[in-house]
Structures are given as structure tokens and as C-alpha cells.
């Protein structure tokens, strides 16, 4: 349905579409149409199919001269595809593997749009981005993630607020919709284009990726591709196997292998260091008997109600890090008990400020998002006195003893000298290791600050001393030369520290994405070293079992594989490359190979090793590839891409009339299911919690009343509202609607109309339930 109507019969536009049955017969709609179709050369058909399946503006090879001269050859295809995705969908995600130069690609894409743009980056990366802008004489406002996290959100400078393109660096930080920063960004980018940049979009689950898409996509935008609702998909209510093929339309996520394999010009020589991943070191911060006793004692703590398991998990994490970190967490836990008792005596719950005093955000970011709402909901009952006694016993057990884990680290540093970064989860551990290793030319960074063994320093000073080449600095004076850098994960994002040749995961993080970010500081294009190494420390068995850390990592790795992450790290090193999203990149190459593409509806028959057909079909406004093989039809753009590539070199075959017809008949059932899914997403879904599902009947009822009055202007307004609600909403549009519905005053049509007018136009892509065969390729085995 179109976004508005001004005729006196506008009410029919409102009431009709949700009553329209799925078109029949589909076989007729899917057959080549008259002069537009017909047999054509296989290369031309494959080119037409590839261009259509990319589902964006015409993607012609513009050549290097169309892009800034500082863009490397392997970065140009990424920039071209991102520009096309932005033009088609209003947003895109750049998730190339670490070290391929995503910042340069993002800047080139922003400049190509020839409109003011704003950078949204972590505060620690502002100097790096300012340097990049200055290097290429580019002026752009920068706002920080931290400013969006503030309560209330700090207003943007006027020059930034006027921007219609936002480049979000380290975009994975916006994966959680329950955070202030996600809500602030969602509102900020309404009606603007959004370029998300991160090598690790999936940290914990596939929903991370979908929440990023919701910043610029409406909820039903991918229904024709098998994802009827992005919001329902985040809840696990959509088949995960359909998400990656749909997501590929929005993502450039190239593995290093894909980039090195080259494009039309042949392989590209990229100089990455050779990886050497040592066997994990299993060691505890105390003898096994002490660790086992501490694990048992932590298991006896019961304060926190339903949050007690999470509180115990935090203590166990710190025990896995170091005894100093564990003792600091015991002190925080006891402070939490004090506050809970005080709040209970006052008949109230903990305040957010009190919670943050007990659990500093920088120390427990990954857990705090879960703990915060759960703990604040506790009724305030005083903890059992047994917890006090158990904490005292744990403090006594955690007194200074031999640190087997730190001993193992020292042996490692002695055995293989070289610049090394040691990553830890806990600031207390970083301080402890710096003190213990102070004679090894060590320094540390935590948060915005840093420290040499001799005293305090700025973060910038420490990084320049440790990695002068990567930071573009002169060699430090001998007194500040640094071979060992101890850091928390705040250092793991965005920075180039490739003077170093080894990363030590002293603590295993919550997410494999953190492992990739850490290694990415040194595993970069143009490294100074032929080879680099990683070493992971794992907790001893009793503690490992209590943490179930490796099982958690395995589950998150499975989510990364499902999402097609370009780089996946495990505790034992790189898992290998996941090329699940590379097929769109290969399509771009196919689209440029041939000269003129075949007309819409054309088909070709070629020889191959199987009996199969590829049907490129536009339905519900989007394009998908259906592969028919063995009498079964499946939506499979990955397999379709391989078959289209085969068509460029395959021998033509004689066409037998029934072959294409049979494929169309088999595919019709799947197409019918997809069309029904689009229709259900708009009108018949049973998701009763959605605003749209409650409001559409209300607006339709108002439309009937307006029709009886003959109020054409009111009907036009209601028509536009139904179109808006039926199309689903972005996360920001939904937040604005929530503001309207949360007012105390009764809801009126005028309120909804005002909300609708604040939003960008729906556009002309809403083509309802039309079906069109774009191209068909039949593969016949040699007889």
C-alpha cells in the first residue's frame, strides 16, 4: 500500500490490502513474460541475476579514480558495495575482519555521499579519528558513545544534529537495546543513513546483529527474505538459518581469505603476519586446594535473591583473574550487603547510584546490564547472616599465597622475549601484575589512564612508549622503553599496536568477540613482524567447571558462525574464516563480468554436474534466489551464487521446454509461503504486544467513522497511518511512538498524525505482494 491517498475513496486503500489473498496462480506470474523474457546467453543471464540479487542501484565498476587515492585496491569493492547498500536500505554494516582498514573504507564511503556526516566513536578513539580526518583534510563533527550513554543524553552540537549520515565506529557497543546509548542513538538516526563499523557485531547471540539492523530497518523489512519480524527474530522466534542470507544484503563482512583471493584483477598481495597459537596454559591464582575451597565457599553465598547466581559468577570471574581482584570483589560484595541491609531497614530498594558504587561499570560492563535491573527489583530483604560469615572465611582463605598463574606468565616471558600485550578483565589484576613485573620494562593502561613502573602517566604516553612505530611517535627515552603492556579490555578496540608480536589472554573474556578484538591490536595489515603469537590462560579444573566458561564461549562462537562473522577466535586461537557472507561480495564481481545484462525474465541452460535450476525472483519488494534441485525448492543465495559463477564458463545446453516449467511449479509453493509471511507480518500476526497490532484496528475503526462522515482529509491521514503501522518501525520510530502512548491524556488521531509527520516518508519501495521472475538458469548434466 502506498503511503497516502487524497481521493474520497481513500478508505478502500486502508481497508483493502489486508483482505487481499495471496496471488494465484503463481505459476503464471513466475513464467517469463512475453518479449521481456526469452533465451539469452548464459553469461548475460548470470550477470542479470547477480545484479538483481544484489538488490541495489546499478553497480558498475567505476575504477580506482572514482575513490580517494588513499583507498587501497582491496578496499574499493567494499566501499562500492557499502554505498549501494546505503542507497537501497538506508543503512549498512561494515564488518570486515580485523586489520583490513575499516576506518579508511568508512571515511571514503562517507565522503562519497557528499553530505555532512557525523562520527560516533568511543572517547578513547577520538584522537585517532581526529588524526585520520586531519590527515586527509576532512572536517566532520565527532560525538562519543559516552555522551550518548549519559542520563540525560547530552545534546549534540548543532552541526552534528543537522547531519543525515552517521558513521558508528565500534558499533557492537550498541547491540543491547536496553542501554541508554542504544536508545539515544536510535532516536538520533531516525530518517538518517547509518554506517555501522565493527569487526565483531555478534558478541553473545545472533540477536546482537539484529538489534544493530533495527537502528535503520523497519521491523518487517526482511519479511520477503524469510525474516518476518526483526524484533521476533531477536527473541529466537525466527529460524536462524534464514537470518544470515537475509543479513548478507546489509553487510560487508569479508574474510581475509576472500580479500586475498582477489577480484577481477587477480589475487591481491596483502602482508599479514603468520599466526602461531600456543596451547592454552591452565593455571590458577592459588594452589588447587585453595582454589577448590574458595569455589565451594562462593557457592554458599545466597544474597541477591534471583540475582545470586550472577553475583557468585562475578566473584568466580575475579578469582580466575587473580587473588587481588578476588579480594577487591569480596569487598564490593560486602558493601552490597551493607547497602541492601540499609535499604531494607528504610523500607526501600537500592537506587541505581548505590548499585553503581558496588559494581563499577568499567569493571563489570558485560554483567552489569543483566545484574542492574534484577538487583533493583529485589524486595530489599536483609541477606542471611551466613553470607557475612562466609565472606570472612573467604577473605582468610584468599590471603597471599603462591600465585601459580603469575608464575606461569613469568616463565612464558622468560622463554620467548619480545613485545607482549597482556590482557586482563580486572583493573586490580593489571595493577598487581604491573607491580610484580615492574623490572621487565612494563607499563599498564586501564580506562583513560596509564602507568609506568616508575609512576603515573597518561594513556597516550604509555602507548607511544610501547608502540612508537604504530603510534607514529619517536622512540622513547631509554628510561621509558616498554616491552610489556598490561591492559584491560578498554584497550582492545580500534587501536594499532603492531609493534608487539604477542598477545596473552591472561583472563578469558565473556565473548569470543573480545578475543578477536584483542588479537586485532597486533594481527594487522603491514605488521612489523613476520609472525605473531597468542597464548590463552584457562582457569584450573574446579574453577573452570564452576564458571562453565568454555561452554559459554562455544555457544557464542556458534552464534558468530551462524551470523557469518568474518573472523572468529577461540581460547585456542583462530577458528578459521567464516565465508558465510562472502557470497554477496562474489556477486558484485559477477555483476561486472559480462557486458550487457540480459533483459528481465531471460533464461539460459548450461551443462553441469547436476540437475538444478536457479530462479531469481522479486517478491514483496525484495529479490531472492530459489534453487530447485531433486524436486525440492529452497531459498539459497549462497548455492545460487556458485551456480551463477559456473554459468560464466559452462557450455550451453539445448533447452527442453518442460525443464524450466517444472522448476517454476516446484518453486511456486515456496514463493506462496513467502508471500503469506509478508502478509502475516503486516496484518495477521498474533504478536499482541506490538504497538501496531493494537493501533491498526483502532485506526481502521476511526476510518469507518470518517467514511460515514464523508471526511476525505481524515481518511487520507488514516491511510498514511495504517501504511506506517503496517510497515513496521525502526527502533527509534518505536521509541517515539512509545513516548506518545505513555502520556496520561487519552490518545487521539491527531497525536498519531503528529508522530507520523515527525518521521521520514515511507518511500516508494512498498510494492505489496507483486511477484516477478527476474532471471532463470537451468543446469543439465551431460548425457
Predicted regions and their residues:
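Inter-lobe coupling linker of SF2 helicases/translocases
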Residues: 142-174, 178-191, 196-199, 215-359, ...
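Pre-Walker A (Motif I) flank of P-loop NTPase domains
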Residues: 88-92, 115, 193, 418-419, ...
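Charged, low-complexity
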Residues: 2-91, 164
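SF2 helicase/translocase NTPase motor core
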Residues: 47-73, 80, 90, 102-107, ...
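Conserved SF2 helicase motif VI
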Residues: 512-529
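Conserved Helicase C-terminal RecA-like lobe
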Residues: 63-71, 97, 105, 109, ...
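A short beta-strand element within the Helicase C-terminal
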Residues: 211, 496-507, 533-536
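C-terminal accessory region of SF2 helicases/translocases
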Residues: 14-15, 19-23, 34-41, 52, ...
Amino acid at each position: 500500500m502506498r503511503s497516502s491517498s487524497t481521493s474520497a475513496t481513500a478508505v478502500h486503500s486502508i481497508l483493502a490490502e489486508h483482505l487481499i489473498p495471496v496471488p494465484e496462480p503463481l505459476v503464471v506470474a513466475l513464467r517469463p513474460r512475453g518479449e521481456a523474457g526469452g533465451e539469452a546467453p548464459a553469461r548475460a543471464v548470470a550477470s542479470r541475476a547477480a545484479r538483481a540479487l544484489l538488490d541495489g542501484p546499478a553497480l558498475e565498476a567505476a575504477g580506482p579514480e572514482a575513490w580517494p587515492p588513499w583507498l587501497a585496491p582491496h578496499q574499493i569493492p567494499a566501499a562500492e558495495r557499502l554505498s549501494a547498500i546505503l542507497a537501497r536500505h538506508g543503512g549498512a554494516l561494515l564488518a570486515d575482519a580485523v586489520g583490513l582498514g575499516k576506518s579508511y573504507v568508512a571515511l571514503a564511503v562517507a565522503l562519497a555521499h557528499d553530505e555532512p556526516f557525523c562520527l560516533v566513536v568511543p572517547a578513547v578513539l577520538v584522537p585517532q579519528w581526529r588524526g585520520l580526518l586531519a590527515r586527509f583534510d576532512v572536517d566532520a563533527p565527532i560525538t562519543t558513545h559516552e555522551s550518548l550513554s549519559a542520563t540525560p543524553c547530552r545534546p549534540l552540537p548543532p552541526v552534528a544534529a543537522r547531519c543525515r549520515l552517521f558513521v558508528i565506529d565500534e558499533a557492537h557497543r550498541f547491540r543491547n537495546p536496553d542501554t541508554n546509548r542504544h536508545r539515544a542513538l536510535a532516536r538520533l538516526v531516525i530518517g538518517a543513513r547509518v554506517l555501522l563499523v565493527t569487526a565483531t557485531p555478534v558478541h553473545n547471540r545472533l540477536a546482537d546483529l539484529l538489534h544493530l539492523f533495527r537502528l535503520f530497518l523497519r521491523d518487517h523489512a526482511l519479511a520477503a527474505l524469510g525474516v518476518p519480524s526483526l524484533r521476533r527474530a531477536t527473541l529466537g522466534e525466527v529460524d536462524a538459518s534464514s537470518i544470515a542470507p537475509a543479513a548478507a544484503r546489509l553487510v560487508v563482512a569479508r574474510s581475509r581469505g576472500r580479500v586475498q583471493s582477489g577480484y577481477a584483477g587477480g589475487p591481491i598481495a596483502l602482508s599479514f603476519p603468520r599466526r602461531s597459537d600456543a596451547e592454552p596454559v591452565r593455571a590458577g591464582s592459588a594452589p588447587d586446594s585453595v582454589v577448590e575451597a574458595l569455589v565451594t565457599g562462593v557457592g554458599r553465598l545466597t544474597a541477591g535473591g534471583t540475582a545470586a547466581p550472577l553475583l557468585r559468577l562475578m566473584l568466580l570471574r575475579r578469582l580466575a583473574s587473580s587473588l587481588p581482584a578476588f579480594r577487591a570483589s569480596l569487598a564490593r560484595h560486602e558493601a552490597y550487603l551493607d547497602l541492601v541491609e540499609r535499604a531494607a531497614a528504610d523500607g526501600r530498594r537500592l537506587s541505581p547510584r548505590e548499585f553503581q558504587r558496588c559494581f563499577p561499570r568499567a569493571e563489570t560492563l558485560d554483567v552489569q546490564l543483566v545484574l542492574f535491573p534484577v538487583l533493583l527489583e529485589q524486595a530489599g530483604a536483609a541477606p542471611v547472616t551466613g553470607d557475612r560469615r562466609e565472606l570472612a572465611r573467604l577473605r582468610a582463605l584468599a590471603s597471599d599465597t603462591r600465585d601459580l598463574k603469575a608464575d606461569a606468565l613469568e616463565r612464558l616471558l622468560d622463554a620467548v622475549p619480545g613485545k607482549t600485550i597482556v590482557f586482563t578483565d580486572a583493573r586490580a589484576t593489571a595493577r598487581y601484575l604491573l607491580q610484580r613485573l615492574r623490572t621487565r620494562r612494563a607499563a599498564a593502561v586501564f580506562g583513560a589512564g596509564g602507568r609506568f613502573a616508575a609512576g603515573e602517566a597518561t594513556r597516550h604516553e604509555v602507548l607511544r612508549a610501547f608502540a612508537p612505530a604504530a603510534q607514529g611517535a619517536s622512540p622513547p627515552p631509554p628510561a621509558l622503553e616498554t616491552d610489556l603492556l598490561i591492559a584491560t579490555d578498554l584497550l582492545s578496540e580500534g587501536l594499532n599496536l603492531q609493534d608487539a608480536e604477542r598477545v596473552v589472554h591472561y583472563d578469558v573474556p565473556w565473548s569470543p568477540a573480545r578475543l578477536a578484538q584483542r588479537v586485532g591490536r597486533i594481527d594487522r595489515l603491514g605488521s612489523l613482524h613476520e609472525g605473531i603469537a597468542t597464548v590463552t590462560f584457562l582457569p584450573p579444573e574446579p574453577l573452570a567447571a564452576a564458571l562453565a566458561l568454555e561452554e559459554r564461549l562455544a555457544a557464542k562462537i556458534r552464534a558468530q558462525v551462524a551470523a557469518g562473522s568474518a573472523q572468529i577466535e577461540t581460547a585456542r586461537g583462530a577458528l578459521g574464516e567464516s565465508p558465510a557472507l562472502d557470497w554477496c561480495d562474489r556477486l558484485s564481481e559477477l555483476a561486472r563480468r559480462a557486458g550487457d545484462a540480459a533483459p528481465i525474465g531471460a533464461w539460459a541452460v548450461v551443462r553441469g554436474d547436476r540437475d538444478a535450476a536457479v530462479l531469481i525472483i522479486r517478491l514483496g519488494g525484495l529479490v531472492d534466489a530459489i534453487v530447485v534441485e531433486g524436486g525440492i525448492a529452497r531459498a539459497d543465495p549462497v548455492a545460487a551464487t556458485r551456480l551463477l559463477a559456473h554459468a560464466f564458463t559452462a557450455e550451453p545446453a539445448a533447452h527442453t521446454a518442460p525443464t524450466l516449467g517444472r522448476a517454476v511449479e516446484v518453486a511456486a509453493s515456496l514463493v506462496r509461503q513467502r508471500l503469506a509471511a509478508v502478509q502475516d507480518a503486516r496484518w495477521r500476526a498474533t504478536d499482541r504486544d506490538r504497538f501496531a497490532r493494537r493501533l491498526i484496528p483502532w485506526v481502521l475503526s476511526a476510518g469507518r467513522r470518517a467514511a460515514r462522515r464523508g471526511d476525505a482529509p481524515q481518511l487520507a491521514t488514516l491511510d498514511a497511518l495504517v501504511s506506517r503501522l503496517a510497515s513496521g518501525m525502526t527502533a527509534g520510530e518505536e521509541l517515539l511512538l512509545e513516548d506518545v502512548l505513555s502520556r496520561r491524556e487519552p490518545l487521539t488521531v491527531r497525536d498519531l498524525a503528529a508522530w507520523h509527520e515527525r518521521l521520514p516518508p515511507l518511500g516508494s519501495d512498498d510494492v505489496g505482494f507483486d511477484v516477478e521472475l527476474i532471471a532463470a538458469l537451468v543446469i543439465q548434466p551431460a548425457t
